Amino acid sequence: MGIPMQIYQDGKGVQFYHTRYQNVFDERASKYGNYTVNNDYPQLPDTIKEHIDQLTFSNVGEDGGDVGNYSEEDDDGDEEKELEDVFRSNRGLEFVRINNYFTTHDLQSFKSFRNFNSKYWIFYSNQAEDKKLLLYDFNGQHLIFIKQQFYGQLNLLLSDAIICMDCNFGYNSNTIQILVGFQNGKLLKLNCDLNGNVNNHLLLKDPSTSSHQSHLSILNVWAGLLPHFVVSFSLKDGLLITSLDHQQSNGSFQSFHTNIDLPVDLRTTTNVKSVLNFPQFTLYKGNDMIFHCKNLLGSDASTLNKEINFMLKIDEDVQKIDYLLKTNHILLETNMRYLSIPTRDPIENSNSSPPVSDSEVYPIFYKTQELHVHASGTGRQIANNGKYIFITEQHLYGTALSVYKYSISFKRWLFVGYSDIRAKYGIRSVKDLFVGNCPSVNSPVLTILTDDNNIQTILLK
Protein backbone atom coordinates (compact mmCIF):
# COMPACT_ATOMS: atom_id res chain seq x y z
CA MET A 1 0.00 0.00 0.00
CA GLY A 2 2.88 2.36 -0.67
CA ILE A 3 4.77 1.40 2.50
CA PRO A 4 8.46 0.72 1.71
CA MET A 5 9.65 -2.72 2.78
CA GLN A 6 13.23 -3.86 3.22
CA ILE A 7 14.52 -7.36 2.40
CA TYR A 8 18.06 -8.62 2.29
CA GLN A 9 19.39 -10.83 -0.48
CA ASP A 10 23.05 -11.85 -0.49
CA GLY A 11 23.78 -9.11 2.04
CA LYS A 12 22.36 -6.34 -0.16
CA GLY A 13 19.29 -4.29 0.61
CA VAL A 14 16.46 -4.17 -1.91
CA GLN A 15 13.66 -1.64 -1.46
CA PHE A 16 10.18 -1.77 -2.96
CA TYR A 17 8.18 1.38 -3.61
CA HIS A 18 4.87 2.58 -4.95
CA THR A 19 4.41 1.74 -8.64
CA ARG A 20 3.33 5.24 -9.66
CA TYR A 21 6.87 6.49 -8.99
CA GLN A 22 8.67 3.77 -10.97
CA ASN A 23 8.88 5.88 -14.14
CA VAL A 24 10.93 8.63 -12.47
CA PHE A 25 14.05 9.02 -14.63
CA ASP A 26 16.71 8.91 -11.94
CA GLU A 27 19.27 6.16 -11.51
CA ARG A 28 19.13 6.47 -7.75
CA ALA A 29 15.33 6.37 -7.80
CA SER A 30 15.45 3.11 -9.77
CA LYS A 31 17.92 1.61 -7.34
CA TYR A 32 16.71 2.87 -3.99
CA GLY A 33 13.11 3.95 -4.49
CA ASN A 34 14.11 7.52 -3.54
CA TYR A 35 14.07 10.72 -5.52
CA THR A 36 15.84 14.08 -5.45
CA VAL A 37 13.31 16.80 -4.67
CA ASN A 38 15.56 19.80 -5.30
CA ASN A 39 16.88 19.30 -8.85
CA ASP A 40 16.02 22.94 -9.64
CA TYR A 41 18.92 24.07 -7.44
CA PRO A 42 22.59 23.71 -8.41
CA GLN A 43 24.89 21.23 -6.74
CA LEU A 44 26.88 22.50 -3.76
CA PRO A 45 30.38 23.42 -5.07
CA ASP A 46 33.46 21.82 -3.49
CA THR A 47 34.83 25.22 -2.49
CA ILE A 48 31.72 25.93 -0.41
CA LYS A 49 31.88 22.43 1.09
CA GLU A 50 35.44 23.14 2.23
CA HIS A 51 34.34 26.47 3.72
CA ILE A 52 31.48 24.79 5.58
CA ASP A 53 33.81 22.07 6.88
CA GLN A 54 36.08 24.76 8.31
CA LEU A 55 33.15 26.55 9.95
CA THR A 56 31.77 23.30 11.39
CA PHE A 57 35.14 22.34 12.87
CA SER A 58 35.51 25.82 14.34
CA ASN A 59 32.02 25.69 15.90
CA VAL A 60 32.68 22.31 17.54
CA GLY A 61 35.83 23.66 19.12
CA GLU A 62 34.14 26.81 20.41
CA ASP A 63 31.25 24.89 21.93
CA GLY A 64 33.53 22.68 23.94
CA GLY A 65 32.57 19.47 22.17
CA ASP A 66 28.87 19.54 23.02
CA VAL A 67 28.02 19.27 19.36
CA GLY A 68 30.04 16.09 19.01
CA ASN A 69 29.00 12.55 19.77
CA TYR A 70 29.64 10.61 22.92
CA SER A 71 32.01 7.67 22.47
CA GLU A 72 32.93 4.70 24.59
CA GLU A 73 36.36 6.21 25.13
CA ASP A 74 34.67 9.19 26.76
CA ASP A 75 32.97 6.77 29.13
CA ASP A 76 36.17 5.08 30.33
CA GLY A 77 36.43 7.51 33.22
CA ASP A 78 32.71 7.42 33.99
CA GLU A 79 32.56 4.21 36.03
CA GLU A 80 32.93 6.18 39.25
CA LYS A 81 30.28 8.59 37.95
CA GLU A 82 27.86 5.69 37.39
CA LEU A 83 28.46 4.50 40.95
CA GLU A 84 27.75 8.05 42.13
CA ASP A 85 24.50 8.06 40.15
CA VAL A 86 23.48 4.74 41.77
CA PHE A 87 24.17 6.34 45.14
CA ARG A 88 22.03 9.31 44.09
CA SER A 89 19.12 7.03 43.22
CA ASN A 90 19.30 5.49 46.69
CA ARG A 91 19.36 8.78 48.60
CA GLY A 92 17.37 11.02 46.23
CA LEU A 93 18.47 13.96 44.10
CA GLU A 94 19.87 17.18 45.49
CA PHE A 95 19.40 20.44 43.58
CA VAL A 96 20.57 23.95 44.38
CA ARG A 97 18.63 26.98 43.07
CA ILE A 98 21.07 29.47 41.58
CA ASN A 99 18.68 31.97 39.98
CA ASN A 100 15.01 32.99 39.99
CA TYR A 101 14.11 35.38 37.16
CA PHE A 102 10.61 36.84 36.97
CA THR A 103 9.38 38.21 33.66
CA THR A 104 6.54 40.67 33.15
CA HIS A 105 5.72 38.99 29.82
CA ASP A 106 3.02 36.33 29.92
CA LEU A 107 4.92 33.44 28.34
CA GLN A 108 2.22 30.83 28.93
CA SER A 109 0.78 31.24 25.43
CA PHE A 110 4.23 31.39 23.79
CA LYS A 111 5.95 28.58 21.94
CA SER A 112 9.68 28.08 22.29
CA PHE A 113 12.82 26.73 20.65
CA ARG A 114 16.32 26.13 21.93
CA ASN A 115 18.90 27.52 19.52
CA PHE A 116 21.53 25.28 17.91
CA ASN A 117 24.28 25.72 20.54
CA SER A 118 21.99 26.05 23.57
CA LYS A 119 22.94 29.66 24.29
CA TYR A 120 19.45 31.10 23.75
CA TRP A 121 15.86 30.12 24.42
CA ILE A 122 13.63 31.61 21.70
CA PHE A 123 10.04 32.47 22.66
CA TYR A 124 7.43 33.65 20.17
CA SER A 125 3.73 34.38 20.07
CA ASN A 126 1.75 33.58 16.92
CA GLN A 127 -1.23 35.73 17.91
CA ALA A 128 -2.49 37.51 14.82
CA GLU A 129 -2.74 41.02 16.28
CA ASP A 130 0.27 41.00 18.57
CA LYS A 131 3.37 39.18 17.34
CA LYS A 132 6.06 38.97 20.00
CA LEU A 133 9.57 37.55 19.90
CA LEU A 134 11.88 37.17 22.91
CA LEU A 135 15.29 35.61 23.56
CA TYR A 136 16.36 34.28 26.94
CA ASP A 137 20.14 34.44 27.38
CA PHE A 138 21.19 31.37 29.39
CA ASN A 139 24.60 32.79 30.26
CA GLY A 140 23.34 36.26 31.24
CA GLN A 141 20.06 34.83 32.61
CA HIS A 142 17.86 37.61 31.26
CA LEU A 143 15.24 38.17 28.53
CA ILE A 144 15.82 40.20 25.35
CA PHE A 145 12.64 41.67 23.85
CA ILE A 146 12.90 41.90 20.03
CA LYS A 147 11.41 45.16 18.73
CA GLN A 148 11.24 47.24 15.55
CA GLN A 149 11.71 50.98 15.19
CA PHE A 150 8.19 51.48 13.83
CA TYR A 151 5.09 50.14 15.59
CA GLY A 152 3.50 47.21 13.76
CA GLN A 153 6.54 46.49 11.57
CA LEU A 154 7.33 43.25 13.41
CA ASN A 155 3.68 42.18 13.05
CA LEU A 156 4.02 42.64 9.30
CA LEU A 157 7.28 40.68 9.05
CA LEU A 158 5.90 37.83 11.19
CA SER A 159 2.44 37.88 9.63
CA ASP A 160 2.42 34.17 8.75
CA ALA A 161 2.39 31.14 11.04
CA ILE A 162 5.88 30.37 12.38
CA ILE A 163 7.08 26.75 12.22
CA CYS A 164 10.75 26.89 13.26
CA MET A 165 13.40 29.31 14.56
CA ASP A 166 17.12 29.47 15.33
CA CYS A 167 19.67 32.19 16.08
CA ASN A 168 23.39 32.90 16.18
CA PHE A 169 25.79 35.79 16.49
CA GLY A 170 26.57 37.85 13.39
CA TYR A 171 30.05 38.91 12.29
CA ASN A 172 30.69 39.99 15.87
CA SER A 173 29.26 39.23 19.32
CA ASN A 174 27.35 42.54 19.39
CA THR A 175 24.71 41.42 16.87
CA ILE A 176 22.28 38.51 16.86
CA GLN A 177 20.85 37.00 13.68
CA ILE A 178 17.49 35.23 14.01
CA LEU A 179 16.18 32.78 11.40
CA VAL A 180 12.41 32.31 11.08
CA GLY A 181 10.79 29.58 8.95
CA PHE A 182 7.10 29.96 8.08
CA GLN A 183 4.23 27.70 7.16
CA ASN A 184 3.91 29.25 3.69
CA GLY A 185 7.56 28.52 2.83
CA LYS A 186 8.96 31.97 3.64
CA LEU A 187 12.41 32.15 5.26
CA LEU A 188 13.36 35.36 7.08
CA LYS A 189 16.54 36.59 8.78
CA LEU A 190 16.36 39.36 11.40
CA ASN A 191 19.47 41.27 12.50
CA CYS A 192 19.31 42.89 15.93
CA ASP A 193 21.63 44.24 18.61
CA LEU A 194 22.03 42.82 22.12
CA ASN A 195 19.19 45.07 23.31
CA GLY A 196 16.79 43.47 20.82
CA ASN A 197 16.54 46.40 18.38
CA VAL A 198 16.07 45.09 14.82
CA ASN A 199 18.24 47.15 12.48
CA ASN A 200 17.59 45.24 9.23
CA HIS A 201 16.10 42.06 7.83
CA LEU A 202 16.54 39.83 4.78
CA LEU A 203 13.92 37.71 3.04
CA LEU A 204 15.97 34.64 2.11
CA LYS A 205 13.09 32.72 0.55
CA ASP A 206 9.84 34.16 -0.74
CA PRO A 207 7.34 31.58 -2.05
CA SER A 208 5.81 32.47 -5.39
CA THR A 209 2.42 31.19 -4.23
CA SER A 210 0.31 32.12 -1.24
CA SER A 211 -0.81 28.51 -0.83
CA HIS A 212 -0.48 27.06 2.67
CA GLN A 213 -0.05 23.45 1.61
CA SER A 214 1.86 21.44 4.18
CA HIS A 215 4.71 20.52 1.83
CA LEU A 216 5.66 24.22 1.47
CA SER A 217 6.42 24.71 5.16
CA ILE A 218 9.97 25.32 6.33
CA LEU A 219 10.21 22.56 8.93
CA ASN A 220 13.79 23.09 10.14
CA VAL A 221 16.42 25.83 10.06
CA TRP A 222 20.04 25.76 11.28
CA ALA A 223 21.88 28.95 12.24
CA GLY A 224 25.19 27.33 13.14
CA LEU A 225 26.83 28.46 9.88
CA LEU A 226 25.78 32.11 10.13
CA PRO A 227 26.69 34.72 9.02
CA HIS A 228 27.81 32.90 5.84
CA PHE A 229 25.28 30.08 5.27
CA VAL A 230 21.75 29.00 6.23
CA VAL A 231 20.59 25.37 6.23
CA SER A 232 16.86 24.70 5.82
CA PHE A 233 14.54 21.76 5.20
CA SER A 234 11.10 21.58 3.61
CA LEU A 235 9.14 18.79 1.97
CA LYS A 236 9.01 20.81 -1.24
CA ASP A 237 12.71 21.59 -1.67
CA GLY A 238 14.39 19.11 0.64
CA LEU A 239 17.61 20.15 2.36
CA LEU A 240 19.05 23.40 1.03
CA ILE A 241 22.17 25.38 1.90
CA THR A 242 21.75 29.09 1.15
CA SER A 243 24.90 31.17 0.76
CA LEU A 244 24.64 34.72 2.08
CA ASP A 245 27.94 35.49 0.34
CA HIS A 246 26.42 34.80 -3.11
CA GLN A 247 23.72 37.36 -3.92
CA GLN A 248 22.25 37.14 -7.42
CA SER A 249 21.47 40.00 -9.79
CA ASN A 250 17.77 39.94 -8.83
CA GLY A 251 18.68 40.43 -5.17
CA SER A 252 17.96 36.86 -4.07
CA PHE A 253 20.54 34.60 -2.48
CA GLN A 254 21.85 31.45 -4.14
CA SER A 255 20.70 28.14 -2.67
CA PHE A 256 22.34 24.77 -3.30
CA HIS A 257 21.01 21.27 -2.89
CA THR A 258 22.84 18.58 -0.95
CA ASN A 259 23.53 15.04 -2.15
CA ILE A 260 20.85 13.59 0.06
CA ASP A 261 17.78 11.92 -1.43
CA LEU A 262 14.48 11.68 0.38
CA PRO A 263 11.88 8.88 0.57
CA VAL A 264 9.73 8.63 -2.53
CA ASP A 265 6.37 9.08 -0.79
CA LEU A 266 7.46 11.94 1.47
CA ARG A 267 5.16 14.60 -0.04
CA THR A 268 2.09 12.47 0.63
CA THR A 269 3.05 11.82 4.25
CA THR A 270 1.00 13.63 6.89
CA ASN A 271 3.00 12.88 10.06
CA VAL A 272 6.50 14.06 9.16
CA LYS A 273 8.85 14.78 12.09
CA SER A 274 12.38 15.96 11.42
CA VAL A 275 15.36 17.26 13.37
CA LEU A 276 18.47 18.98 12.02
CA ASN A 277 21.79 19.17 13.84
CA PHE A 278 24.14 19.95 10.97
CA PRO A 279 25.73 17.91 9.49
CA GLN A 280 23.28 15.34 10.90
CA PHE A 281 19.69 15.04 9.72
CA THR A 282 16.95 12.67 10.89
CA LEU A 283 13.47 12.17 9.46
CA TYR A 284 10.42 10.25 10.66
CA LYS A 285 7.72 9.86 8.02
CA GLY A 286 5.39 7.39 9.64
CA ASN A 287 5.15 3.67 8.87
CA ASP A 288 7.39 2.95 11.90
CA MET A 289 10.54 3.99 10.05
CA ILE A 290 13.23 6.59 10.76
CA PHE A 291 15.75 7.79 8.17
CA HIS A 292 19.07 9.05 9.54
CA CYS A 293 22.02 10.72 7.81
CA LYS A 294 25.17 11.27 9.87
CA ASN A 295 26.85 13.71 7.47
CA LEU A 296 24.94 15.65 4.80
CA LEU A 297 28.19 16.61 3.07
CA GLY A 298 29.66 13.12 3.06
CA SER A 299 30.36 11.27 -0.16
CA ASP A 300 27.82 8.58 0.78
CA ALA A 301 24.99 11.02 1.47
CA SER A 302 23.21 10.30 -1.83
CA THR A 303 20.93 8.12 0.28
CA LEU A 304 20.01 8.50 3.91
CA ASN A 305 22.65 6.14 5.23
CA LYS A 306 20.53 4.56 7.92
CA GLU A 307 17.01 3.15 7.83
CA ILE A 308 15.75 2.31 11.31
CA ASN A 309 12.67 0.13 11.64
CA PHE A 310 10.78 -0.13 14.91
CA MET A 311 7.32 -1.05 16.13
CA LEU A 312 4.76 1.08 17.95
CA LYS A 313 1.97 -0.13 20.17
CA ILE A 314 -1.67 -0.01 19.10
CA ASP A 315 -2.95 3.59 19.13
CA GLU A 316 0.59 4.88 19.76
CA ASP A 317 1.57 8.00 17.79
CA VAL A 318 4.94 9.73 17.41
CA GLN A 319 4.82 13.30 18.74
CA LYS A 320 8.45 14.45 18.53
CA ILE A 321 11.99 13.35 17.70
CA ASP A 322 15.23 14.79 19.04
CA TYR A 323 18.92 13.97 19.33
CA LEU A 324 20.76 12.51 22.30
CA LEU A 325 24.01 13.84 20.89
CA LYS A 326 26.57 12.28 23.20
CA THR A 327 25.15 8.77 22.97
CA ASN A 328 24.59 8.38 19.19
CA HIS A 329 20.92 7.84 19.97
CA ILE A 330 17.66 9.38 18.76
CA LEU A 331 15.05 10.35 21.35
CA LEU A 332 11.53 9.45 20.23
CA GLU A 333 8.51 10.74 22.14
CA THR A 334 5.11 9.13 21.61
CA ASN A 335 1.79 9.66 23.34
CA MET A 336 2.62 6.67 25.58
CA ARG A 337 6.38 6.62 26.25
CA TYR A 338 9.89 7.88 25.51
CA LEU A 339 12.19 5.67 23.43
CA SER A 340 15.92 5.75 22.74
CA ILE A 341 16.96 4.41 19.33
CA PRO A 342 20.68 3.96 18.50
CA THR A 343 22.31 4.97 15.24
CA ARG A 344 25.52 3.50 13.88
CA ASP A 345 28.51 5.15 12.27
CA PRO A 346 28.67 4.79 8.47
CA ILE A 347 31.54 2.31 8.77
CA GLU A 348 29.28 0.11 10.87
CA ASN A 349 26.36 0.61 8.51
CA SER A 350 27.76 -1.50 5.71
CA ASN A 351 25.75 -3.85 3.51
CA SER A 352 26.74 -6.74 5.77
CA SER A 353 25.35 -5.06 8.88
CA PRO A 354 21.86 -6.10 9.98
CA PRO A 355 19.20 -3.41 10.32
CA VAL A 356 18.41 -1.98 13.73
CA SER A 357 15.85 -4.26 15.33
CA ASP A 358 13.32 -3.77 18.09
CA SER A 359 15.75 -5.40 20.53
CA GLU A 360 17.92 -2.28 20.17
CA VAL A 361 15.10 0.17 20.89
CA TYR A 362 15.25 1.15 24.55
CA PRO A 363 12.18 2.38 26.46
CA ILE A 364 13.18 5.15 28.86
CA PHE A 365 9.95 6.17 30.50
CA TYR A 366 6.30 5.08 30.29
CA LYS A 367 3.83 7.93 30.62
CA THR A 368 1.23 7.61 33.33
CA GLN A 369 -2.29 6.84 32.15
CA GLU A 370 -3.89 10.01 33.50
CA LEU A 371 -1.39 12.22 31.66
CA HIS A 372 -0.68 10.55 28.33
CA VAL A 373 -4.27 10.99 27.15
CA HIS A 374 -3.89 14.77 27.36
CA ALA A 375 -2.67 16.98 24.55
CA SER A 376 1.06 17.18 23.88
CA GLY A 377 2.86 19.63 26.15
CA THR A 378 0.41 19.55 29.08
CA GLY A 379 1.52 18.25 32.46
CA ARG A 380 4.87 16.87 31.27
CA GLN A 381 8.10 18.27 29.86
CA ILE A 382 11.38 16.67 28.81
CA ALA A 383 14.89 17.97 28.12
CA ASN A 384 18.34 16.44 27.72
CA ASN A 385 21.99 17.39 27.38
CA GLY A 386 23.07 14.13 25.74
CA LYS A 387 24.15 12.36 28.93
CA TYR A 388 21.14 13.08 31.14
CA ILE A 389 17.41 13.12 30.43
CA PHE A 390 15.14 15.18 32.72
CA ILE A 391 11.39 14.60 32.78
CA THR A 392 8.87 16.58 34.83
CA GLU A 393 5.36 15.35 35.64
CA GLN A 394 2.64 17.32 37.37
CA HIS A 395 0.54 15.27 39.79
CA LEU A 396 -2.22 16.16 42.22
CA TYR A 397 0.02 16.61 45.27
CA GLY A 398 3.44 17.16 43.75
CA THR A 399 5.56 17.92 40.69
CA ALA A 400 8.16 15.22 40.09
CA LEU A 401 11.48 15.84 38.35
CA SER A 402 12.98 12.48 37.26
CA VAL A 403 16.51 12.00 35.93
CA TYR A 404 17.88 9.25 33.68
CA LYS A 405 21.40 8.59 32.43
CA TYR A 406 22.60 6.34 29.60
CA SER A 407 25.10 3.66 30.64
CA ILE A 408 27.59 2.49 28.04
CA SER A 409 28.39 -0.48 30.29
CA PHE A 410 24.79 -1.70 30.61
CA LYS A 411 23.63 -0.41 27.19
CA ARG A 412 20.47 1.07 28.66
CA TRP A 413 19.09 4.11 30.45
CA LEU A 414 19.45 4.07 34.23
CA PHE A 415 17.08 5.82 36.61
CA VAL A 416 19.21 8.23 38.66
CA GLY A 417 16.48 9.55 40.95
CA TYR A 418 13.77 12.17 41.35
CA SER A 419 12.89 15.25 43.35
CA ASP A 420 9.59 16.93 44.26
CA ILE A 421 10.24 20.44 42.94
CA ARG A 422 6.82 21.65 44.11
CA ALA A 423 7.67 20.93 47.73
CA LYS A 424 11.22 22.27 47.43
CA TYR A 425 10.85 25.30 45.14
CA GLY A 426 7.10 25.91 44.93
CA ILE A 427 6.99 24.91 41.24
CA ARG A 428 3.48 23.64 40.65
CA SER A 429 3.48 23.38 36.86
CA VAL A 430 6.38 23.33 34.37
CA LYS A 431 5.56 25.13 31.14
CA ASP A 432 8.93 24.47 29.50
CA LEU A 433 12.26 22.94 30.43
CA PHE A 434 15.86 23.30 29.27
CA VAL A 435 19.03 21.56 30.43
CA GLY A 436 22.55 22.85 29.91
CA ASN A 437 25.86 22.23 31.60
CA CYS A 438 27.90 24.16 34.17
CA PRO A 439 31.57 23.73 33.11
CA SER A 440 32.96 24.92 36.44
CA VAL A 441 31.40 22.01 38.35
CA ASN A 442 30.75 19.59 35.44
CA SER A 443 27.12 19.19 36.39
CA PRO A 444 23.80 19.70 34.57
CA VAL A 445 21.95 22.99 34.99
CA LEU A 446 18.17 23.10 34.53
CA THR A 447 16.25 26.19 33.46
CA ILE A 448 12.53 25.89 34.18
CA LEU A 449 9.71 28.12 32.92
CA THR A 450 6.92 27.91 35.51
CA ASP A 451 3.21 28.61 35.23
CA ASP A 452 3.63 31.93 37.09
CA ASN A 453 6.20 33.28 34.55
CA ASN A 454 9.22 32.57 36.71
CA ILE A 455 12.35 31.28 35.00
CA GLN A 456 14.12 29.27 37.70
CA THR A 457 17.63 27.86 37.31
CA ILE A 458 18.70 24.91 39.45
CA LEU A 459 21.92 22.89 39.58
CA LEU A 460 22.13 19.10 40.05
CA LYS A 461 24.68 18.48 42.82
From Swiss-Prot:
The keyword Ribosomal protein does not apply. One of its GO terms (biological process) is glycerol biosynthetic process. Keywords: Cytoplasm, Nucleus. The gene is YIG1. It comes from Saccharomyces cerevisiae (strain ATCC 204508 / S288c). Involved in the regulation of anaerobiotic glycerol metabolism. GO terms for cellular component: cytosol; nucleus. It is found in: Cytoplasm; Nucleus. This is Protein YIG1. Residues 71-80 have a biased composition (Acidic residues). Residues 58-80 are annotated as: Disordered. Its main location: cytoplasm.
